């Protein structure tokens, strides 16, 4: 058998894998990396094939352009760049691969700052760079690969795919635009100014690639159209705000209020009770007129300032349009408008739910329009505490600066009533309200009529029923809440499927508040803990030895059993066998104290310690020592005659002696005499016991003591006291075993060699 098969102690698979050899037959020595390194030119040749780096002009003059190797490829890329600038937005990956636009402030680069490693990594296709006319942006594009036709088709295909796959984002936070604005004639989606900016930025490709052509590119014309349309859009916006129709509501409300006040004044003059109300209404009307005049003056000054700023911005844009195709003022104004329009989006949820705390301390909210201001003015007419004219003017200025649509907020205010909660129109709640009310937009006439109808209500009715409406609305809300709560409780209680477990709730509450006993105990009527665990279930000290080993043989039947019982030192001296050792079972705590010799403590009050010691020594000497054993003598005839005589026991009333009026010395003397008489009294009990035992012999009378004193196991115990007192060590155990073996050998050798009686005699110990 082969040696390798014999040594296979593990599994066959692992042993085979460990013994297998690989000769490298499946290895392809001709690696592609070697061919690539061989085919690549050297560094010197690579530097010769590369074009010279562009020389940057630091004076913002005309930059000399470097000629390309192929003019047709440049024209094709120019057309493609124009298509990109026309409005097709690439995905992020395509923009990173084809066009890189730097939005940060550009630091002018020198030829030394250009990384050579990026040029060395792509020897066949290098990047050419050319600065924009303003010298602030650098656009890089790759040269086409040698196979031009295939690359052109691939580029066209990628452009078409990007057009189809580019999602057209929905317009965010736009309710409806009914303002007379002109639509921009471009492929850009409406409501996205970032895409306009990207289109104008991407239009720079045409100028950066081909600066030799005198013809303006498509992107330039489109960017100019975007700028002109943006300017027209802003002009139309401000013209729209200058229209007097926007503030027609205030004039209508004012006229209606004046008419109603004149009618009410004629009625109130006749009634003396309403004269005070008329005076208050006149004062409120005067305050309202003053507030409206201040609002108008502030509004006119605000609009004129905004128009003046816009004209200056337009003039600066016209001057800078020749040097830069991308207008910086346009981006600033558009970004300001976007920030003001979407200012609330930056708010967090907690900030957006902070409502107006008070009329005088709260700041005006951004995004409120003229209708909301008119609503606030009328509410201030009803309430005595009105906002100041400066706050209202500031609110108006924020309305114009925010750029929100007029009719957009008018729809919101038309749906809000006095009982509704006026939420913020910016931030988190703006989008929620816009989504809910997007499908419920009203026409211009309806919205205006609704606002006019709500504003032209009678001032008298509002003053009289203001507090009543508030109280009624609160009462109605409370009633509806109570009804809903009662109905829910009724349905839950009366339903057959589910009922509230009131007992469990009550028990749980009572258990938490009550003083509960620990588990296994209860409290009796006195409040004391009572253990419910029976004594048989309580754990006791378990003996380390079995009950057979530690059993106390109180009445041995044979001498050998007695000897083994005494030799069982584990039973006597092991503290773990408390349950089985006799004598410890009794409760010593219940026993009375041991008797003491009273004579030792009679004169204990004396301070002489030496004298007390002498008396104790003398008492111990004179103390009678009881005889060993029980020695009962046989009674004589005289003693037997005494038993027939009546011998009464002397008695005295101790209570009478103690409660007498005599002195303490006399009381003590009487008690001592009574004690002496009791000591001298002979009841004849010993004589009676001896008489009852006169028929028994001496051996029978002394049986108990003699049997215990002369027992065999007691004698062996005293004889083997040295062996029993030794510790159970290994040496002592070995010696005991050897002694037993020698003793057994003697028995076997001394016995007669009869097979039948040999083992039986050893077991019966008859040797």
Swiss-Prot record:
Biased composition (Polar residues): 119-138, 372-386, 447-458, 485-495
Residue spans of biased composition, Basic and acidic residues class: 35-48, 150-171, 180-196, 219-240, 285-299, 391-402, 459-484
Region spans: Disordered: 20-408, 439-501, 506-525
Domain of life the protein comes from: Eukaryota
InterPro entries in the cross-refs: Fyv8 (IPR026248)
Physiological role: Involved in the resistance to unfolded protein response (UPR)-inducing agents.
Family affiliation: Belongs to the FYV8 family.
Protein name: Protein FYV8
Protein species of origin: Candida glabrata (strain ATCC 2001 / BCRC 20586 / JCM 3761 / NBRC 0622 / NRRL Y-65 / CBS 138) (Yeast)
Gene that this polypeptide is encoded by: FYV8
């Amino acid at each position: 058998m082969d040696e390798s098969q014999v040594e296979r102690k593990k599994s066959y698979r692992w042993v085979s894998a460990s013994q297998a050899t690989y000769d490298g037959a499946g290895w392809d020595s001709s690696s592609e990396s070697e061919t690539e390194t061989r085919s690549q030119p050297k560094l010197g040749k690579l530097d010769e094939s590369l074009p010279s780096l562009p020389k940057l002009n630091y004076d913002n003059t005309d930059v000399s352009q470097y000629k390309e190797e192929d003019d047709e490829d440049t024209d094709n890329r120019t057309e493609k760049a124009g298509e990109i600038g026309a409005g097709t937005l690439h995905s992020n990956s395509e923009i990173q691969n084809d066009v890189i636009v730097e939005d940060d402030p550009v630091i002018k680069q020198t030829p030394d700052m250009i990384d050579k490693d990026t040029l060395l990594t792509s020897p066949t296709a290098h990047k050419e760079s050319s600065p924009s006319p303003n010298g602030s942006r650098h656009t890089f594009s790759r040269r086409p690969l040698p196979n031009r036709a295939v690359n052109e088709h691939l580029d066209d295909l990628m452009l078409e795919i990007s057009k189809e796959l580019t999602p057209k984002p929905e317009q965010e936070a736009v309710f409806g635009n009914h303002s007379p604005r002109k639509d921009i004639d471009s492929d850009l989606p409406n409501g996205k100014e970032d895409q306009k900016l990207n289109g104008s930025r991407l239009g720079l490709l045409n100028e950066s690639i081909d600066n030799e052509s005198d013809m303006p590119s498509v992107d330039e014309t489109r960017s100019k159209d975007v700028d002109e349309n943006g300017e027209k859009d802003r002009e139309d916006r401000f013209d729209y705000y200058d229209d007097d129709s926007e503030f027609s509501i205030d004039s209508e409300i004012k006229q209606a209020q004046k008419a109603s006040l004149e009618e009410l004044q004629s009625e109130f003059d006749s009634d003396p009770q309403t004269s005070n109300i008329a005076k208050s209404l006149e004062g409120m009307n005067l305050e309202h007129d003053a507030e409206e005049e201040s609002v108008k003056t502030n509004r006119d000054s605000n609009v004129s300032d905004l128009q003046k700023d816009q004209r200056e911005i337009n003039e600066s844009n016209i001057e800078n349009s020749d040097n830069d195709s991308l207008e910086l003022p346009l981006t600033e104004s558009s970004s300001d408008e976007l920030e003001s329009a979407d200012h609330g989006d930056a708010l967090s949820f907690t900030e957006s739910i902070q409502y107006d705390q008070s009329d005088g301390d709260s700041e005006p909210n951004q995004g409120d329009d003229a209708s909301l201001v008119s609503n606030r003015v009328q509410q201030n007419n009803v309430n005595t505490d009105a906002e100041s004219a400066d706050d209202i003017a500031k609110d108006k200025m924020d309305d114009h600066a925010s750029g929100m649509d007029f009719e957009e907020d008018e729809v919101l205010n038309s749906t809000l009533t006095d009982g509704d909660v006026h939420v913020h129109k910016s931030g988190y709640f703006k989008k929620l309200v816009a989504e809910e009310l997007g499908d419920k937009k009203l026409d211009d006439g309806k919205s205006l009529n609704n606002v006019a109808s709500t504003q032209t209500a009678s001032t008298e009715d509002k003053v009289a029923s203001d507090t009543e409406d508030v109280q009624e609305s609160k009462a109605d809300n409370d009633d509806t809440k109570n009804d809903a709560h009662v109905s829910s409780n009724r349905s839950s209680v009366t339903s057959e499927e589910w009922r509230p477990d009131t007992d469990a709730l009550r028990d749980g509450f009572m258990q938490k508040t009550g003083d509960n006993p620990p588990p296994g105990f209860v409290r009796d009527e006195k409040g004391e803990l009572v253990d419910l665990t029976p004594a048989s279930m309580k754990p006791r000290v378990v003996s380390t030895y079995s009950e057979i080993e530690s059993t106390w043989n109180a009445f041995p039947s044979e001498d050998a059993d007695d000897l083994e019982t005494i030799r069982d030192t584990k039973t006597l001296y092991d503290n773990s066998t408390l349950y089985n050792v006799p004598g410890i079972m009794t409760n010593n705590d219940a026993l009375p104290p041991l008797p003491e010799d009273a004579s030792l403590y009679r004169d204990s009050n004396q301070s002489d310690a030496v004298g007390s010691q002498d008396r104790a020594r003398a008492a111990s000497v004179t103390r009678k020592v009881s005889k060993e054993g029980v020695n009962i003598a046989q009674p004589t005839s005289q003693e037997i005659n005494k038993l027939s005589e009546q011998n009464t026991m002397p008695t005295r009333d101790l209570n009478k002696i103690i409660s007498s009026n005599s002195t303490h010395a006399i009381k003590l003397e009487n008690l001592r005499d009574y004690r002496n008489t009791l000591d001298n009294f002979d009841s004849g009990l010993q004589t009676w016991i001896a008489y009852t035992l006169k028929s028994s012999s001496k051996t029978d009378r002394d049986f108990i003591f003699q049997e215990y004193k002369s027992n065999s196991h007691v004698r062996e115990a005293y004889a083997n006291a040295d062996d029993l007192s030794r510790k159970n060590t290994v040496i002592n155990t070995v010696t005991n075993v050897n002694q037993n073996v020698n003793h057994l050998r003697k028995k076997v050798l001394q016995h007669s060699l009869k097979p039948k009686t040999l083992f039986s005699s050893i077991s019966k110990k008859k040797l």
